[in-house]
Amino acid sequence: KIEGIISVTIVGSFTRTYDLDKIGDLDIVIISKKITGKLIKTSKKKIKNITSKYPILNKKLKINDTFGPVKYDATKYFTVHMMIYDIKGHIDHAINSPFTCYDWQRSNWFKGKKLKAIFPVENIYLRDFFEARRNSKDYLRDLKKNKISIRKYQISIKKVSLKKRYYKINTKNRGEFVFHIVNNLINNYNKFYTNKNIKVSSKNFGKLFLKITKNDRPLWNKFKYLSKQKINLSTSYSNKSILLGEKFITYFNQFLRNESKKYKRLVFLRHAKTFVNDKTFLGQGRNPEILKIKLKPKLKEKYNPIYSSPLKRSISTAKLFGKKNPIINEYLSEINY
């Protein structure tokens, strides 16, 4: 036990294979009440003590304390990917990286609190594919720069802060990173489409790959070869792996754009400023109009239907965005809390 730590969870490939000899690294998520330099050092020391008592596969121990999909030579190293968050950091991660945290929630390899009990990701939404951290655009940007964006704690006397860095893609990571991208994008889309937090089956993975890529079988065959290399813990991948990744992401982005057209978009909007915009509480007791003189909305489209509370400020705001009068609903009135 380490004082301040409330949760330790093993996530990633080990929770599916149960075989240390067949994984690239052992992913461990640690949640603490507070992040300190001492806590990070103590956690590393604890990992070293455990592995020294129970030598694993006659490999040299390597502790990767960065946040990101960087891999090391699994034939030489037993890598422990140690990811430490404080409670606030975990909440931020769950909000900004829902794909990762949603996946971690499936793990039953934990001590202390389950990750979902600390702060849950309830579902994957279509907007996550466009706005969340490590979305397809972020991946494509990293591939074109030949770098992987990672984060690492910077420890100083006064504080511990998380800084963004870039790791140059080497011959191993260009294949590992592309596999990570394709595998995660397909699995994340499957979670959204099925509305279930499950890993897609091998059969359905192939079907989704071909659906997304418009039945591009040559690309599918290249990915299957890449997958075999990963299973065999390859240390070097072809330069063409990057092209595979870029082509798949291009397909995926177009596929998502087409999918997004099938769904209705809901927009929640607060009323515009009023003449009593003085940081006092309005509630239902006061009913001022909005300052229309300061509003010059430039809209490419009008919305219909639009729902509004019966208050003047809400009705006037709603009329700026639609051709028809808004539908009035009492439930949208500001609460007198």
Residue ranges: model-predicted function:
Residues 40-169:
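Conserved NTP/Mg2+-binding pocket subregion across the NTase superfamily
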Residues 332-337:
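Short alpha-helix plus adjacent loop in nuclease-associated cores
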Residues 2-26, 31-38:
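Active-site nucleotide-donor binding segment shared across nucleotidyl transfer reactions
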Residues 8, 80-82, 326:
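Generic structural signal for residues in well-ordered beta-strands
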Residues 115-260:
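Conserved nucleotidyltransferase catalytic core and NTase-mimicking acidic/glycine-rich helix/loop elements
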